[in-house]
Curated annotation (Swiss-Prot):
The gene is ybeY. Zn(2+) binds at residues 124, 128, 134. Single strand-specific metallo-endoribonuclease involved in late-stage 70S ribosome quality control and in maturation of the 3' terminus of the 16S rRNA. It comes from Nitrosomonas europaea (strain ATCC 19718 / CIP 103999 / KCTC 2705 / NBRC 14298). This is Endoribonuclease YbeY. It is found in: Cytoplasm. One of its GO terms (molecular function) is zinc ion binding. Binds 1 zinc ion. Gene3D superfamilies: Metalloproteases ('zincins'), catalytic domain (3.40.390.30). Its main location: cytoplasm.
């Protein structure tokens, strides 16, 4: 897993956000075109958190996404979101890696609004950080229900309904 004290690449653009219940750092190491701003990431993270946390959200390009997915999951391609949990105590400590090109391609292919898709995957990562998973069917139902509840409360459409 990446270490919290070492950036994965040189010179990321960091946007630290300090508040008592959430310390959020957003690292933009991919092209920032069409990537939501720190204010939106903060809103989405806070909506999904159930306890204090220190979170780094890192937006990466396809190459870094492929390297991380290969090194930590044994997969040969980039994925949309990876979550690295460092501590399940309070505050939670973890990193969420979002692969910008994968997210953009998925949104286009699925007919989803790009911002809504970023919101969904950020919420998905935060739920993983809190111990939720979707390996077993019954766990997937719980996690997807929570994702849907949170994202619709924020005014976005249900991410599991196919958009036409």
């Amino acid at each position: 897993m990446p270490t919290r004290n070492m950036p994965l690449t040189k010179n990321p653009v960091e946007s630290p956000d300090h508040e008592q219940e959430l310390v959020l750092t957003v690292q933009y190491v991919a092209d920032k075109t069409d990537i939501p701003n720190r204010r939106l990431f903060r809103k989405w993270v806070k909506a999904a958190l159930s306890k204090p946390a220190e979170v780094v959200i890192r937006i990466v390009d396809r190459q870094e996404g492929e390297i991380l997915n290969r090194d930590f999951r044994g997969k040969s391609s980039a994925t949309n979101v990876l979550t690295f949990v460092y501590d399940d105590d309070v505050p939670l400590l973890g990193d969420i890696v979002l692969c910008a090109p994968v997210i953009c391609n998925e949104a286009q292919q699925q007919g989803k609004d790009l911002t809504a898709h970023y919101a969904h995957l950020t919420i998905h990562g935060i739920l993983h950080l809190q111990g939720y998973d979707h390996i077993r069917d019954e766990d997937a139902v719980v996690m997807e229900s929570l994702e849907t509840e949170i994202i619709t409360r924020l005014g976005y459409p249900d991410p599991y309904v196919i958009q036409h």
